[in-house]
Structure formats: structure tokens, C-alpha cells
Swiss-Prot record:
This is Chorismate synthase. It comes from the Bacteria. FMN binds at residues 125-127, 237-238, 277, 292-296, 318. The lineage of its organism: Bacteria, Pseudomonadati, Pseudomonadota, Gammaproteobacteria, Alteromonadales. PANTHER family: CHORISMATE SYNTHASE. Its cofactor is FMNH2.
Amino acid sequence: MPGNSFGQLFKITTFGESHGPSLGAVVDGCPAGLELTEADLQEALDRRKPGQNRYTTARREADQVKILSGVFEGVTTGTSIGLLIENTDQRSQDYSDIKDTFRPGHADYTYQHKYGVRDYRGGGRSSARETAMRVAAGAIADKLLRQQGIQVQAALTQMGDVVASNIDWQQVRENELFCGDANAVEAMQELIRQLKKEGDSIGAKIRVQATGVPPGWGEPVFDRLDADLAKALMSINAVKAVSVGDGFEVVSQRGSEHRDEMTPDGFLSNHAGGVLGGISSGQPIFADIALKPTSSIAISGRTIDRWGNEQAIVTKGRHDPCVGIRAVPIVEAMTSLVLADHWLRQRAHNLTAQTETPDISR
């Protein structure tokens, strides 16, 4: 099964299934000399882990990460960093009744066609449980980026019809929904309570931004910074759309409005989202991500079994009524992984590049 690795110079490979004994990751390319402890990674994992509040899945996992290699006396050695998280709260019996039945909207049907065999327990490899390792690896990337003055942060900006009118980043850090609008938080909480009563789910939208990225990062033409960012974000479970900058709003914009005019004192706008020609402009990089509502709900639906017979299905188990909540730290992690990779690529390929053009983004 290829497709389990991401990145070129800062590269991660993950392994493990939702109901297997453990999840793991190998991080290659981290420079030597970075101070790193399990506590650094745990802080990020605690923001993502299940069972933390009444608005997410009831599955409770400690998500205690272990650093197996690549760190000696609290400092990275430049060798591969091995990470491991043990699964401790599996309830595989929740899926025994549907082991031969395909859950609509999930990867059951497509995995069966691709491999001829699948782990039916919680989706196996296709489960969002895998993203715990992305968050752990992303925490390493984030620490590297912060040393360069770069900050990556994300927020829940929409849940169903409830839209946040603004993003107060301090507010994002203080509430369990990662939403930056206190008024929207209350409406979202009420929506989740209603969804739980109905046994249904809802979609969401997330905004991610990176500040402090200097001009020049990105590798045209196929490894454009925004292309790699879009791929990274689209690889997250349930993500169905990614837009960079003004995204789909550019359809109704005119060139005179959309172009980000420049003056000696800086850019006059940032419709491009901090990327021009696939290369960072030095302005804040931002993107929006749309996530579908989970199909694991308590409402009966139509499907088929592995032999093609029609079946009715009600998904048991413990699931998030809105996957967008716990996706926020995952979005941050994937963004950090992309930026760390492009930071190393810029150093490797263009370290001696010089220009007389001033950096007007500062």
C-alpha cells in the first residue's frame, strides 16, 4: 500500500489502524540540534485527542506519544525520529454486526474493491485515528518553524449554517470548539446538542493561516507552495474542498480588484493568500477547508453488503457529530509539515540566491 509518506526533505511516514494495537510515524529530515521532548508533542496531541469534551466522540484515548529514536538527551540527532502511540480504547465489537456491510459515505466499498480485503473495525487504515501521528509529526515541524519566526494557526469558522463573523485568535485558544467568535460558539454548541438528539451530523469550515513566511518558498511548477498545501489539506479525512486566498470568490472579482497592488510600503491587499506563481510573497498565507458531515450516524440508511444484497444500516460506535472540531489541530499540523519541507528545500536549492528587490511584506 503506497501513499503513506508525505514530504521530500522533511518527510513523514505513518502506519497503524484505528483498532490495531498502536499507531506510529517515522519523521525523516529533521535537522540536528532541535530541543525536543515528548511533552512538546503531547501539547499538540491533547488538542486533537478524542473524548475531551461533550461535543466530540465518546472514544477516550490518552494519545500518549513515545519518542523511540532520533532524540538524545532532549536534542534531535538528525536521524530518523520514531514515534508511537498505543490504542487503548478500542471497541471492535461495535463493528462486528456490519463487517460484511458497506457504510455509505465511508471508504469501506472502495477499499474492498481496491484491495479485496479490508479492516472493518472503525475503518482500519482509512480512519481519522491515523491523523494522531500527523499531529505529533506536525508538532516537530511547528517547533522548527517557530524558530524561524513563523506561526501557524487554524480556527473553526463555520458549522452548518452557523458562521463566525470574525476570528479572535485568543478566543480560539480558550474554547473547546476552536472558534474565534464567542457568539458563534454558543450557537454551535446548541447545534451539536440538537444533532446528538437527532443522531445526525453536520459539516464544517476551517481557516488556516501562516504568518512570518518570507518571500521565496515554493518550487514551480508542480511543487508550487499552494499546490502542496492543497494536497496536504485534501489528504485529511472528510475534507472535500480547499481554497487558497479568496478561493472561489475570485470568479466574481475583476482584475482591477483582485490584483494585489504593491507600493514601496507594502502590498495593498492579499487576495492571493500569500502565494504568487506558487511562491510565497511574504504576506500571510491563508486557506479555507470544507469538511463533509460524517456518515457514521444513528439514522437508518440504505446500502449493500459485500455480495451486493441491499441492506439497512445504522452505524454504532462512537463518532463526532462534527468532525471539523478535532480537525483544527490536524489542519495546523499538515500546514506546518508543508512549510517545514519547503523551508528545507529553499535552503538546499537557493541558499546562495541574491536579489536587490526589497522585501515589502515586512
